[in-house]
Amino acid sequence: MTQAFEIHGSSSVSTTTAIEFLLDETGSMMHVWDQTIGGFNEYVNSQRAQPGTCLLSLTKFDTSGVRNSYSDSNIQEVAYLDRNSYRPNQSTNLYDAIGQRIKALEARVTAGAYPSDTAFLFVIMTDGQDNASKEYDASGVKVMIEDKKTSGWTFVFLGANQDAWQVGQTFGMAKGNTMTYAAGNVAGAMETLSGATTAYRGMRSKGMVASASASENFFADASTPSAAPVDAGNVFAAVMPNPGMGHRYTTKKAK
């Protein structure tokens, strides 16, 4: 169960959540092109239905660049992804994308772009490990993430077809904030992410903020999605907690 405590010393409670969403647009995502578009759009829809203000920033990345589609847009007004705005290509510059976007968000915070008690949620979704970064490496990104955790930022990592905890720990991700999923079950992963995001925002709307320990257990209160087919045959993917390895989508034969 998520732990929380009340916000004191303020006559009003901010219900603003700023979500920085970092989405892999590399060539391997071509296999789940439409699923990724649909899953992201459903995530947007689900968060539109929640109370409070949600500011969404979307950045896509591959070796051609780290491209920010929009920053701090009211989630009620953002454009959906489609095959024109999301076009997978090239290799994975994951660390460069994380480092650049932390710097960009940090600059906006320093400039006073947000209420002082805004909740910052930094979501990273990829189906591959870094193989093309030039500006940042895992150790450099880890230092940046650890620093921002002390300021109350929450970092979440979703990795397809990999051990998300094993990969994520190399650059500072907490076990409870990582999730492994089958690439063919993007919808299930997005559903779980949305449930956890809703719980996170719900605490804010009640005048609560996550404790230090709870901020590293992001998926604790997320709903478990229904089984959804992965790419091949009659194999199905379901989300299951995996002690010591964050949350994991494991596959099993349908009965």
Model-identified regions with their sequence ranges:
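Acidic, low-complexity intrinsically disordered regions
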Residues: M1-K255
